[in-house]
Amino acid sequence: MLLHDLAEQKLIHPPKWLPDNLAYLAIVGSESYGANLPGTSDQDLQGFCVPPKSDVFPHLRGEIPGFGRQHQRFGDWQEHHIKQGGKEYDFAVYSIVKFFHLAMENNPNVLDIICVPENCIKHMNKVGQLVRDNRRAFFHAGCFHKFRGYASAQMAAIERGANRANTKRAASIEAHGYDTKFLMHVMRLALECEQILLTGDLDLKRDSQFLLSVRRGDMTLEEGKAWWASKARDLETAYTNCKAVPLEPDEDAIKGLLMQALEMHYGDLSEAVRLETPVEKILADIDVILSKYRV
């Protein structure tokens, strides 16, 4: 596996436990959208892992949240510009807990990770397969606010001439007058959001030819602005009339999926978590009602 190889060569320095507990790793970015340009050697790899049990459940090591010494919990590991074999890698691997939280918030970059085409998956164990198979559980209409916000920020960056000092983008800006990759991302985010709102699913390569043409500079900046203004109105309509996904995340269902994934990795969690049974919940609700009438 790539992480093992790079760690053994001391080219990357993840936590020692991470390579053996990696659940999912995928190629993200332009390659996963089918919009990468010829000759590009950079590869963005992102995914999630399952940290040690005491990191997810700190009470198992005697830690009481808010009292005394608190151990720093693992959130994510990132390393960039790792060169090997003619390629340059950027890594970002999240704790499964952080990953679930960001996915539940419909963070665009995180949702993309579990929606890449199968040929972009570099590593996937049974936990990773479970999460990918249930990716639609994370989708909700809140994607409208998240994706639109990201797209608007990208468009604002284009208009203020961002990335002119970036040597990798300078040629594109010089040739077209703006950062074509930024405009591609504006359109990608809008089209992904529209897919989720209308279909309840996400196919990253659906619009690959269109996105590639935008990245090549086949659209003027004025045409791009007009496209975004029109699509923003379409998104408002799709959000208002959305029926393909729930309005809000189903936190209980997502938490249940997280617990299923953790049990798949750790085994029995009865010593770590006590889940209330339906009968216990009913009895507790009855007790609350009766307590209102007790003298």
Task: Name these PLM-found stretches.
Residues 55-59, 112, 195-203:
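Short, solvent-exposed secondary-structure capping/transition elements
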Residues 11-60:
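Active-site nucleotide-donor binding segment shared across nucleotidyl transfer reactions
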Residues 43-47, 64-68, 121:
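Short, low-complexity, polar/charged sequence segments that are solvent-exposed and flexible
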Residues 52, 60-71:
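Short, His- and charge-rich active-site/binding loops that engage polyanionic ligands
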Residues 52, 106, 196:
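Phosphate/oxyanion-binding loops and surfaces in catalytic or ligand/nucleic-acid-binding neighborhoods
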Residues 69-193, 204, 208, 212:
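Conserved NTP/Mg2+-binding pocket subregion across the NTase superfamily
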Residues 1-11, 17, 294-295:
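N-terminal regions immediately upstream of nucleotidyltransferase
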Residues 9, 137, 144, 148-161, ...:
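Structured mid-to-C-terminal alpha-helical surface segments
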